[in-house]
């Protein structure tokens, strides 16, 4: 990987910084989340939200979406050039929920985007604070990952719905920068590339002319991002082939789908960050916590600490289970939608169940839902232990495959085996090893066949007590090796529709 020497930690990507030492990183990440908190407090003042209403996760999401929309340059420009009926390109808004006479009411608010931008900049020392915006995008993306299934999107691009564990970050907007690229799964990158290649096949001019040159640069950049996520030489070599193709077409699509399948066992490195709703940072700032001075990290104990001391509420529909709603938000907060349920349950200290068993729908409430019957309850976002977030796929050692699983992309750096049904995965690799990538394909299949489900990943890594902030005493959990835990089994979640 060419950028080896300039590898930045994800906190640096998150804050757009050059290389910094640990203290500087903690300070700049602290500045970023502190800015989000200050913005949130100001918005609550503007909207005259009570303390309880300000802690409502649905209100937090509306406020976050407003600021993201206010800074969405490309869409703003598009809206101004293509005026559509009933949409004011200069305004943004959404539903705000208020408590009136013992009932929840929905109020639709509208604000000038200019005004929202002013409040955001003011909260961020006059800067645009793009890092904070990206942070909010990643929180929304993590929430989508935990809430919706992407079966339809997978099938549309010719991939297998069982590859859902590779789809982290699939709803992130294009403008989410380096921090966004770091959290995208293998499947997400493959899907973006396939969509691009398909456009090129259907539209003769896609790769031509001035625009085509820009398209080509974007294509190669995406290929390089994907290449950087693979950890074996053969997978990377195949990515070079895809990137260098003169005229990307069906052969490249085949190669990409092959690579995506291979990532079920030879997992890629995908970053995980605990991005919390804006109201959580707001609560901390309001209570006098100075994020910049104290420093903050998205991958250590800090988010766990913050959630231990925050009370957040959620609207609950009549037949939803509040404990299940809490699990959904907990998973989103820790970017754990693709983590092994055995690991998540151990860290959380309560059983985390597969999505098919959850009696809850998404967090956001549609405008046509009846507010009369809405109730609210406290989200239980606390944990029993904390663990370091990982950006590796948990392969037992870099060049050799370790057992993957049809649906796990580890979030926490905690020792476990990664059980998987090799037969199921290998069945997808019938025959086709001819063509220009044949030797690489053969090599990849060989590595996958030598993977053993009983291999231990993250050897010796454990969880920590919440009092152990320096991570001195790892507690290595022992898991039932046979029982494998994917969140997506027996899945009946709704599809993500933009």
UniProtKB/Swiss-Prot annotation:
Keyword Ribonucleoprotein in annotation: yes
Q: Where does the UniProt annotation locate this protein?
A: Virion; Host nucleus
One GO term of the biological process aspect: viral penetration into host nucleus
Q: Where is the motif Bipartite nuclear localization signal annotated in this sequence?
A: 198-216
Summarize the PTM comment: Late in virus-infected cells, may be cleaved from a 56-kDa protein to a 53-kDa protein by a cellular caspase. This cleavage might be a marker for the onset of apoptosis in infected cells or have a specific function in virus host interaction.
Q: Which GO terms describe its molecular function?
A: RNA binding; structural molecule activity
**Which segment of this protein is annotated as the motif Unconventional nuclear localization signal?**
1-18
Q: List, alphabetically, the Pfam families matched.
A: Flu_NP
- Region annotation Disordered: where it falls in the sequence: 1-21
The record ties this protein, via InterPro entries, to:
Flu_NP
Q: Which UniProt keywords apply?
A: Capsid protein, Helical capsid protein, Host nucleus, Host-virus interaction, Ribonucleoprotein, RNA-binding, Viral nucleoprotein, Viral penetration into host nucleus, Virion, Virus entry into host cell
Q: Which domain of life is it from?
A: Viruses
- Function noted in UniProt: Encapsidates the negative strand viral RNA, protecting it from nucleases. The encapsidated genomic RNA is termed the ribonucleoprotein (RNP) and serves as template for transcription and replication. The RNP needs to be localized in the host nucleus to start an infectious cycle, but is too large to diffuse through the nuclear pore complex. NP comprises at least 2 nuclear localization signals that are responsible for the active RNP import into the nucleus through cellular importin alpha/beta pathway.
Instruction: Give the quaternary structure.
Output: Homomultimerizes to form the nucleocapsid. May bind host exportin-1/XPO1. Binds to viral genomic RNA. Protein-RNA contacts are mediated by a combination of electrostatic interactions between positively charged residues and the phosphate backbone and planar interactions between aromatic side chains and bases.
Which family does this protein fall into?
Answer: Belongs to the influenza viruses nucleoprotein family.
Name the chain's protein. Answer: Nucleoprotein
The scientific name of the source species is: Influenza A virus (strain A/Turkey/Ireland/1378/1983 H5N8)
Q: Which gene encodes it?
A: NP
């Amino acid at each position: 990987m060419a950028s080896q020497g300039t590898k930045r930690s994800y906190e640096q990507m998150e804050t757009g910084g050059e290389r910094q030492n640990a203290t500087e990183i903690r300070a700049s990440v602290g500045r970023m989340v502190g800015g989000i908190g200050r913005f949130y407090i100001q918005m609550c003042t503007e909207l005259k939200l009570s303390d309880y209403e300000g802690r409502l996760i649905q209100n937090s999401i509306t406020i976050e979406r407003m600021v993201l929309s206010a800074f969405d340059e490309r869409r703003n420009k598009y809206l101004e050039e293509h005026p559509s009926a009933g949409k004011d390109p200069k305004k943004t808004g959404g539903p705000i929920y208020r408590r009136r006479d013992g009932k929840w009411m929905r109020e639709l608010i509208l604000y000038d985007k200019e005004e929202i931008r002013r409040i955001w900049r003011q909260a961020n020392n006059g800067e645009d604070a793009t890092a904070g915006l990206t942070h909010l995008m990643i929180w929304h993306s993590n929430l989508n990952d935990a809430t919706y299934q992407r079966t339809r999107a997978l099938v549309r691009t010719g991939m297998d719905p069982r590859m859902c564990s590779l789809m982290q970050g699939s709803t992130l907007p294009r403008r989410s920068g380096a921090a966004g690229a770091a959290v995208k799964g293998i499947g997400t990158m493959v899907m973006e590339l396939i969509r691009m290649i398909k456009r090129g096949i259907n539209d003769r001019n896609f790769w031509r002319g001035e625009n085509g040159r820009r398209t080509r640069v974007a294509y190669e950049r995406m290929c390089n991002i994907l290449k950087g996520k693979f950890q074996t030489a053969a997978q990377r070599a195949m990515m070079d082939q895809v990137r260098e193709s003169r005229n990307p077409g069906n052969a490249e699509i085949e190669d990409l789908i092959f690579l995506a399948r291979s990532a079920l066992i030879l997992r890629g490195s995908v970053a995980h960050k605990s991005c919390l709703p804006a109201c959580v940072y707001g609560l901390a700032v309001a209570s006098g916590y100075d994020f910049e001075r104290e420093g903050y990290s998205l991958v250590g104990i800090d988010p766990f600490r913050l959630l231990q001391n925050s009370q957040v509420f959620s609207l609950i529909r009549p037949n939803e289970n509040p404990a299940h709603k809490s699990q959904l938000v907990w998973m989103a907060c820790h970017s754990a939608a693709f983590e092994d349920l055995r690991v998540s349950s151990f860290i959380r200290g309560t059983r985390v169940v597969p999505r098919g068993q959850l009696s809850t729908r998404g967090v956001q409430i549609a405008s046509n839902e009846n507010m009369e019957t809405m109730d609210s309850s406290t989200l239980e976002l606390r944990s029993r232990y904390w663990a370091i977030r990982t950006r590796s796929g948990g392969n037992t050692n870099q060049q050799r495959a370790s057992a993957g699983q049809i649906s796990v992309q580890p979030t926490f750096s905690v020792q476990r085996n990664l059980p998987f049904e090799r037969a199921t995965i290998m069945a997808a690799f019938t025959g086709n090893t001819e063509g220009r990538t044949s030797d690489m394909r053969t090599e990849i299949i060989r590595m996958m066949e030598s993977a053993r489900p009983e291999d231990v990943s993250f050897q010796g890594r454990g969880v920590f007590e919440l009092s152990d902030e320096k991570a001195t005493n790892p507690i290595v959990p022992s898991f039932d090796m046979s029982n494998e835990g994917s969140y997506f089994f027996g899945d009946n979640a709704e599809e993500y529709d933009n």
